[in-house]
Amino acid sequence: MVKKFRRLSSGILAMVMIFSLCFTNAVQDASIDISSENETVGLRTQLTFLEGMPGDNHLVYTYQENGQQYKVVEDADVDFMNVYSTSYVMNSEGNYEEIKSQVLNVQPDGNCLLTSTDTHGNSNVSKIDITKSVKSVDKSTEVVGASIARAYTDPGTGEWVTQTWDGSSYIYNMTVTAIGAVLGAAIGGKVGAAIGAIASEYFKKGSDYAYYHVVDSWMMSALYPMTVIIREATHTTYYLDSGHKYSTGTDYYEYDGRW
């Protein structure tokens, strides 16, 4: 009787071990599948805004990364052409210590300069092309360099031209307001609450690039010796990946210069 009980117990134990092993492998396989398909694993958590909201010229927020607490203070000028950011880390005594400062300067030629300075005064200046890559989606869109060429239209007929294109911007190691400034400069829209919220998502994910799909409509008028845009409407969808599977939000910009 004892031998039968032992054999029965051993059989049950073996079944449990086999089931546990199969279950563990199934979980591991599922994890591998998810990580290979979805590269949107968040790096920063508990993002909390203490002063201002994303899209404001002044912003103070805290977040956690790799078990440490950080604080960032940011100030931008009216047009978000210059963004000043200072980052702090909380020490063992619960006080914040400055670890670096950054200055983002968006230049008229479409590029930007990112200057990072550590606590020892060592600075590193990087020149960043905010429109890293641009490609047309429809055949009517002409790509010149890393920009979209707009064709002349006759405002007297109320003619609109619509073009769609995809692009990406390099945002590695940038803060929330700096990312918003880059996106605003790349698309040509105003930095506000919508772009600010999208920038926050990129920041939380620690994204290297911001990807977007743009539907751009405009009307141009001749103003000697050049042509100018008198009306424009731009709808942009932002993504975490180049395949445009994981959206971070949308933004709409409209301009009417007829008045």
Each language-model region and where it sits:
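Sec-dependent signal peptide cleavage junction
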Residues: 10, 19-44
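Bacterial N-terminal signal peptides that target proteins for export
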Residues: 2-12
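Short hydrophobic membrane-inserting alpha-helices and related fusion/pore-forming segments
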Residues: 177-196
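Core beta-strand residues in small-molecule sensory/regulatory alpha/beta domains
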Residues: 88-91, 233-244
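Short, low-complexity, Pro/Ser/Thr/Gly-rich segments in the mature regions of secreted, periplasmic
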Residues: 245-259
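Short Lys/Arg-enriched alpha/beta "domain-start" segment
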Residues: 32-85
